[in-house]
Amino acid sequence: MPRTLQRRPLLAAVGVLLASISSAAVATPVHDRPGNRLEALIEQPAAQAEAEAEQASARFCTADRQWCVRTAREGDDQASQLEIEHRLSGTEEPQTWFIPLDSADADATGTDQPWPFIVRLAPGVDAGQVPSDPQQAALENVLVGVQRSVTTMYSGGDAGASTLVLSRIRHMDDGIQIDPDVLTLPADGHAMIRACFGEQDSARRAGACHDEYSFHGVLTLDPAGQGMPVLRYATTATRFPVGASRLQDSQARGPLRKQDLRTQTDPTCSFQRVLRFDGGRYQPDTPLPECGEFTEL
């Protein structure tokens, strides 16, 4: 559900670019035809000590310092929020808004980090009501995100998964409207599962005593897009050894051969999609495949 919030100052106590979903590198912003821009955010290391004291992530900002984001916990160890700061020209204090995040899975260790990118929308392209106030209409709307990660330990192994959630921030006549979930995508995943429980297993598996799984997503801005930013999502999923499956008992497999001891790309979960804004959310041009074997704990 959209949230419309009145603008308020930040209180002192609150204190072609490839957008790898989990990391950012300094690069030239990517523009599309209407002028939407995908930019890498810059981590602000000077604020790290303050962030740790406040149970917050580092702050990530645009190069011009107009937009900054971070995640922070507020009392409850399981609850966190995404904080967005917007500094307008000629103002001393930034405006700040908060997006509450659902509690982490009680059976897993969870962390929330800002997505280290921002999509800055070109004037007039944002779908929906255009403010009648010319000053509000001239203000910049953006897409910001948070990467939500969970990890767990197994006997002789471990697993982790992260999800990207994008939110839209747009200026309205009566303040800021926050659409907290316009896109949710698997970002990264990994698992290492123990497969040997004795010397016989080790010999049968040619010494490869763990099954390993990996998933990685990349989100980019389509330079040829029109209107609201068109996004491209590309993933790579792999397994080791050849034929490993979390859906089957590894003990039921036959002996591994030397040629099986290599990383195998999964064709179903290595794919590309085009994402367009429709009905208040980003929708893929074709449905995403079921890839829980790579993207879930």
Pin down the residues of each PLM region:
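Acidic, small-residue rich beta-repeat scaffolds with periodic aromatic anchors
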Residues: 27-61, 158-161, 169-297
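Bacterial N-terminal signal peptides that target proteins for export
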Residues: 2-14
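Acidic/hydrophobic-patterned starts of short beta strands in beta-sheet-rich repeat architectures
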Residues: 63-71, 136-150, 224-236
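Short consensus segments that form the blades of beta-propeller domains
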Residues: 70-76, 109, 153-160, 261-267
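N-terminal signal peptide c-region/cleavage motif recognized by signal peptidases
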Residues: 19-22
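Eukaryote-skewed repeat-based solenoidal scaffolds used as protein-protein interaction platforms
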Residues: 134-140, 144-165, 177-189
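A domain-level signal for the mature, folded cores of soluble proteins
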Residues: 51-52, 68-75, 84, 193, ...
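Short N-terminal edge-element motif at the start of the domain
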Residues: 72-152
